[in-house]
């Protein structure tokens, strides 16, 4: 780190370094001496920057504890003020939208769930309306600094469009990042929802399994987020992980032509396969229009129609995981989404995968469940605050 205060750019850079240390230490306090040691800045420079951040309401002094008989003045630590800025995270799914406002520690202060409209434009309007309502209820509308929205498709920064989103149409003519940033008044990041789920899963892991793993979301659609060497892998065109589109025509004994993984293993596919089994006289104790959770539970107890539906879905998913394993050799596969986070589904995939690979990755159901993408959006919005917040506060 270069010390000094000879230029505005240098002051911002140094302020950024100090703010980053406060973010890393939060919620615990940190002393100016420790900040100087970690950043490589001089103590006078650190003291000046901490004073500026304190004046801006970003950090606050924590009164030091005194002990009887102590000689000398104890160090005066400072801590991040959690609600000095707020972020909004959004999971824009095919069946629901989750909108949440969080503080700088990532604590969700307010949250809203909205049934997804059938068009992307309506979903964007719902996100804006919900965000404004949550901020108004909190009484902190002016503190919003950043946002992140997870979308069920591939985001192309140029020309600011979402593609490959069959389950939520209408993105083709919608400059989503530009519109959301303008309407919310803060920078907004757009990211694939399963990539965000992978970000959240990586943060939740406390072992080396978080360095090389695949997060697979199985719900209305199917997608994957790949983490390699601890970094999210997007591919050359941002479309890495579009697992639901791969050809699985050889898995099912159908004459319907080309079948994708999504055609065989998604929630709608499992329901459709179950109805087909019932119509073809497979015994079942369930109603023909049973929910996927009911189908999976019935399959675990031997229901023939339910077992047929789950078996085909699990066989297709095991083939896809085998393909991913040959390609990227993940240490772990984390299943999320409404179907994927069900242990019955994971167990069924595991039993079939063992016949495909000599060494199988660890298969686990997500501990975050259906909130993984939302939590990843909060995390990403917090990360982007680091690049925008100091400039705005030190410039005031």
Model segments located where?
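ATP-binding/phosphotransfer module of carbohydrate and carboxylate kinases, centering on a glycine-rich
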Residues: 1-143, 184, 204-206, 250-396
